[in-house]
Amino acid sequence: MSFPGVIFVVSFFPLLMGIAVYRLLWHPLASFKGPKLAAVTDWWFCKKWLNGRYHQTLEKLQLQYGDVIRIAPNELVFATPEAARDIYTRCNPDQDLQFIKQPPFYKQSEGFPTLVTETDPAAHRTLRKPLERGFSPSSLKDYGRVIERVADDLTAQLEKASEHSNAVDVKAWAARFTFDVITEVTFGKSSGTVAQGKNTVWLDLLTGNIAAAAVGVAIRRQPHAVKTLLRSIFAKLSKTAKLRAQYLSVCRKMCEERLRDPPKAANLFDHVLATCPPVEKDADNHGYLVFLQGQAAALVSGGTETSSTLLSSLIYNLLAHPAHLARLQYEVRNAFSQSGEIDIESTKQLKYLQAVIDESLRIFPPVGFGLPRVCPGAMIGGVYVPKGTVVQAPDILMVRNSRYFVRPYEFLPERWLPKDHEFYDEQFSGDRKEASKPFSLGPRQCIGMSLAYAEWRIVLAKLVLKFDWEIIGETQDLMDVARLKLLWEMPPILVSFKPVGGLAAASPGA
C-alpha cells in the first residue's frame, strides 16, 4: 500500500470508530434496544431488507427486545396499536405535530410527486381531495360493472382450463384480474389481459421489477458518495432504469390516448386531471404529460400488486383449510343461484366472505413492512421519540401477536363474525381488531380500500359459486415460503377449478 493510502486508512479508521461509539453511547436513540450492529450502521438493515426475510427478522427482534426496536442508527420500529395510531394519524397539515413520510424511502428519480410519494401533507391533501370523488359510493357503483365483467371473463377462462383438466397459477390470473380492473377504472378502457389469457407488456413491466425496487430502497439509505457509487454499479448490472423508462412510456401512451379519446364511462382519469398543478405546457405538453403519467402509474401499480397478493393468499389459505372453504361455499351457494346476481350490493350481505377477506388481510398483510415516517419530536405509544427519528409500526408485528389475537398463527375467519352469526365463536371476543390495519390509518389511508373490497367480494363470490377448488401439492404457512422484496414474492399457486353441479351447498355445521 502506498504512503497516501496508509495515511487514508490510519485517518479513516478512527473516524469510523468514533461514529460507532457515538451511535452506541451518545446518540439520541442510544437508550433504545436493538442489535448493536443496527445501531452503528444502515448496512445491517439493508442486509435484512434484501434477503427476503425482513418480516421474520422483525418478529424475532420483537421477541428479543420488546415493542420498541432500534433497527438502524436513526430508526425505530414499534409494535403496538397505540403506537401505530400515534404515527399514522398525525399527518394532517392542520396539526401542530406532523409525522411526514420519510423522503428517502418514497423519493422518485423523475417527474412530479404522486399520491403515494408526496411527502408534504398540504400538497398531499391537494392531490387526494379531487381523487376521493373518484372513489365515492356512486363512482364505485359504476366501477362495479367493470369488476363483474372482468370477473366473468376470469370464470370463462378457468372453465376453459377445466375442460382440459389443466391447473392454473392463481398468482398469474389474480394479477391479470386486478390489473384489468384498475386500468379500466383509471382510463375507461379495457386492457383485456384476462379475456386474452396473457399479459400485456405493461403488466409484465409492473410485476417483473419488484426485487430491483427493493434494492433501490437500500441504496437510497446510503451516504451520498456510497449511494452514487452503488447506483453507478447497479445501473450497469441491472435493466432497472430501462424497464422503468419503458413502464412510464406505456403509461404516457395510455394518457395520450385517453386525452385524445375520452370515454363516456366514469373513470378515475377525470379526477386525475383535476389534481394537475399549473405546469408550463411546451409544444408537446411534456410537463403536463409527465404529471399525468406519474399519477396514472401510481394508481395502476397500487391497484394491481397488493390487491392481487391478497386474492392469491386468500385462495391459498382457504385451500389449506377446507372447513373454512366449505363454510364459504355454503354461504355463497345458498345466497345466489346464478352469477348475474352477484354485484357490489348483494355481496355486502355475505358476512362470512367478509370475514374470510379480513382474516386473509390479517394473517398475510399485503404490505409486509412498516411505512416509515419522520417523527417531529413526540410521544409514541407512551415513549418520547426525538425529532428527526424515522419511525414505523409494521402490521406484521401486531396481527400475529397473541396479545391482540387468539391463536394468531391460525387462519380463523370466525374471529371477524358478528355475534348473531351462526358461526360466531365466543373465544374470539377479546381480539383487538384494531391491531390489524392493512390499509394504514389517518389521512394517508389507502384511497382505494372500498374498490379493493368490492373486487375481492365479487370475484370470490363468482369463483365459489361456479367452481370447486383443488390445490396441487402441499400447503404450508405462506410466511415461510414467501419472500418480502418490497412486495411479496410467492411461489406458483397451482389450483384446479372444476365446475360445480349447480346444487346449493349443504350446511357444513358448526
UniProtKB/Swiss-Prot annotation:
E.C. number(s) listed in UniProt: 1.-.-.-
Membrane spanning stretches: 1-21
GO annotation terms (biological process): terpenoid biosynthetic process
UniProt name for this protein: Cytochrome P450 monooxygenase btcC
GO CC terms in record: membrane
Membrane topology, from the record: Single-pass membrane protein
Gene: btcC
Binding sites annotated in the UniProt record for heme: C446
Alphabetized GO MF terms: heme binding; iron ion binding; monooxygenase activity; oxidoreductase activity, acting on paired donors, with incorporation or reduction of molecular oxygen
Free-text function comment from the UniProt entry: Cytochrome P450 monooxygenase; part of the gene cluster that mediates the biosynthesis of betaestacins. The bifunctional terpene synthase btcA converts isopentenyl diphosphate (IPP) and dimethylallyl diphosphate (DMAPP) into the sesterterpene betaestacin I. The C-terminal prenyltransferase (PT) domain of btcA catalyzes formation of GFPP, whereas the N-terminal terpene cyclase (TC) domain catalyzes the cyclization of GFPP into betaestacin I. The cytochrome P450 monooxygenase btcB is then responsible for the six-step oxidation of betaestacin I to yield betaestacin II.
Enzyme class at the top of the EC tree: oxidoreductase
Record carries keyword Ribonucleoprotein: no
